[in-house]
Amino acid sequence: MATQNPNQPVTYPIFTVRWLAVHTLAVPSVFFVGAIAAMQFIQR
């Protein structure tokens, strides 16, 4: 028990394939939602 430090997880790295997949979808999605929301207020 003394050899396992709970503050240093071994099997959970931060930069994983899941992290990459989430951010490649989330970053453009936030950009497009902001762009579409801004377009709603443009008067012709």
UniProtKB/Swiss-Prot annotation:
Membrane topology (UniProt): Single-pass membrane protein
Cross-referenced InterPro entries: PSII_cyt_b559_bsu, PSII_cyt_b559_CS, PSII_cyt_b559_N
UniProt keyword terms in alphabetical order: Electron transport, Heme, Iron, Membrane, Metal-binding, Photosynthesis, Photosystem II, Thylakoid, Transmembrane, Transmembrane helix, Transport
Positions bound to heme: R18, H23
GO CC term, one of those recorded: photosystem II reaction center
Pfam families assigned to the protein according to its UniProt record, in alphabetical order: Cytochrom_B559 (PF00283)
PROSITE patterns xref list: CYTOCHROME_B559
Key word Translocase present: no
GO biological process per UniProt: photosynthetic electron transport chain
Cofactor: heme b
Transmembrane intervals: 17-41
Source organism, top-level taxon: Bacteria
Cofactor note: With its partner (PsbE) binds heme. PSII binds additional chlorophylls, carotenoids and specific lipids.
Places the protein is found: Cellular thylakoid membrane
Major subcellular site: membrane
Family per similarity comment: Belongs to the PsbE/PsbF family.
Function in brief: This b-type cytochrome is tightly associated with the reaction center of photosystem II (PSII). PSII is a light-driven water:plastoquinone oxidoreductase that uses light energy to abstract electrons from H(2)O, generating O(2) and a proton gradient subsequently used for ATP formation. It consists of a core antenna complex that captures photons, and an electron transfer chain that converts photonic excitation into a charge separation.
Quaternary organization: Heterodimer of an alpha subunit and a beta subunit. PSII is composed of 1 copy each of membrane proteins PsbA, PsbB, PsbC, PsbD, PsbE, PsbF, PsbH, PsbI, PsbJ, PsbK, PsbL, PsbM, PsbT, PsbX, PsbY, PsbZ, Psb30/Ycf12, peripheral proteins PsbO, CyanoQ (PsbQ), PsbU, PsbV and a large number of cofactors. It forms dimeric complexes.
NCBIfam families cross-referenced by the UniProt entry: cyt_b559_beta
Protein name: Cytochrome b559 subunit beta
Organism: Synechocystis sp. (strain ATCC 27184 / PCC 6803 / Kazusa)
Lineage: Bacteria, Bacillati, Cyanobacteriota, Cyanophyceae, Synechococcales
